[in-house]
Amino acid sequence: MLRRLVRLATVAAAAAIAVPALAQAEVMAPDVLVKNVTLEVVDIIRKDQDIQAGGAVAKKKMVALIETKILPHFNFQAMTSSAVGRNWGKANAEQKTRLNEEFKTLLVRTYSSALTAYSDQKFDFRPLRAKPTDTDVTVNVRVIQSGTQPVTIDYDMEKRPSGWKVWDVRIAGVSLVANYRTEFDNLVRDGGVDGLIKALQTKNSSLDPALAASPAGAQKK
């Protein structure tokens, strides 16, 4: 049940942070950005026959969508360092770069699966509770699907010189970053930082070819 709720919520998480090129010309308010882009991306998914058909072509299209529209709007360094937690300080510069790359690849897989699984969920966009001068806000969305309880998504976002960036996503109150931190702590305890990197590489290499063949896009500062 929890896995199903996470999948439903991740659909909205993936869609809401995919920013179209036109939106990048100006800094849009975070709640407006989430609403506008969620509706636009969902409309694309509904109308794309290749995506609706599923299979390898759909997966490749999802990867391209994620790399061009979603990845640039994450603050991956903040997400990775927070997910690795206290062990981040144990990593050297090369290890930090590799951790960042593997974590991006892991999220590509997560969002590819979620977007492919989209099936007419509805979205309730909650009013933003923040001051105009705030540079760190939380945008709230509820995902609604017939026959299930609504799932709440909280996007923790920070204002950067190039616009608003997501640094954590909380699904039904569960932090994506904190959830990975627990797993990563165990891996570092058992095999050190290199053990964590190897575990991430193994997990990412197990992806099907459509997802593994395309590397994660570079982080946009």
Q: Where is each model-derived feature located?
A:
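Bacterial N-terminal signal peptides that target proteins for export
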Residues: 1-12
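Sec/Tat signal peptide C-region and signal peptidase I cleavage site
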Residues: 17-26
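Early exported N-terminus immediately downstream of N-terminal targeting peptides
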Residues: 27-107, 111
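Mature soluble domains of exported/periplasmic/lumenal proteins and thiol-rich metal-chelating peptides
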Residues: 28, 60, 131-133, 161, ...
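Short, hydrophobic secondary-structure boundary micro-motifs
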Residues: 53-54, 123, 196-197
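Surface-exposed, charged secondary-structure patches
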Residues: 109-151, 203-221
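Short beta-strand edge/turn micro-motifs at domain boundaries
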Residues: 150-178
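Low-complexity, intrinsically disordered terminal/linker segments enriched in charged
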Residues: 168-221
